[in-house]
Regions:
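Short juxtamembrane and helix-loop transition motifs at transmembrane-helix boundaries
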Residues: 1-3, 62-70, 130-135, 155-166
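Extracellular-loop-to-transmembrane junctions of the mid-late helices
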Residues: 2-11, 110-156
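Hydrophobic alpha-helical transmembrane segments of multi-pass membrane proteins
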Residues: 5-28, 32-62, 68-86, 101-119
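Alpha-helical transmembrane segments in multipass membrane proteins, preferentially the mid-helix core
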Residues: 16-23, 84-89, 140-165
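Transmembrane helix-loop junctions in multipass membrane proteins, especially transporters and channels
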Residues: 27-28, 56-63, 91-96, 116-124, ...
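Cytoplasmic juxtamembrane regions at transmembrane-helix boundaries
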Residues: 99-106, 163-167
Length: 167
């Protein structure tokens, strides 16, 4: 089963690398859209690799605990950005909205970073196994909030191109 999981992650990372490289010569899109797409692909890649690394590190020697904590911190901090990047790629957002969302994402990342030291959102035990902390629902809320934002952006994009029957 682990080989299948590893192959799935490897294929996902490979696909994201192809998408990142395809942006380099794309002059048909605006610079900001290319930047958002690049951020989306890079974030998905980093999160996938961190998630895979965290799974692989479960139960490894205790000397790897700091690395395990760092990997989970990166993963949990960046994952909510996926929905934000994807939403902004699907339908343009006003700068104010983007700045507010990035501030919320930064606050979430700060909470995850604090959790690396306190264990409130997640912790790694003495046997180097990852566990959810008492405030893990905050991460779930942030991730689901970014997915709701993405769905709302899809709705706005559909509305923008909807034919109303007028002239």
């Amino acid at each position: 089963m682990n080989e299948l999981y590893t192959a799935n992650i490897a294929l996902s990372v490979f696909a994201m690398a192809i998408m990142l490289f395809s942006l380099r010569g794309d002059i048909s899109q605006s610079k900001i859209r290319n930047l958002l797409c690049g951020g989306l692909y890079a974030t998905i890649t980093i999160c996938a690799l961190c998630e895979w690394s965290g799974v692989q590190m479960d139960g490894t020697p205790p000397a790897l605990i700091p690395l395990h904590i760092a990997v989970k911190t990166i993963e949990l901090s960046l994952a909510p950005l996926i929905g934000l990047f994807a939403g902004c790629v699907i339908h343009p957002c006003p700068r104010k909205v983007v700045h507010r969302l990035l501030c919320l994402a930064g606050f979430h990342a700060l909470l995850v970073l604090l959790s690396a030291f306190t264990g409130l959102m997640f912790y790694v035990d003495a046997q180097n196994f990852y566990h959810h902390g008492s405030l893990y629902p905050l991460y779930t809320f942030a991730y689901m909030g970014s997915m709701v934002f993405f769905l709302v952006q899809i709705w706005f994009a559909c509305r923008a191109y909807q034919y109303t029957g007028g002239t």
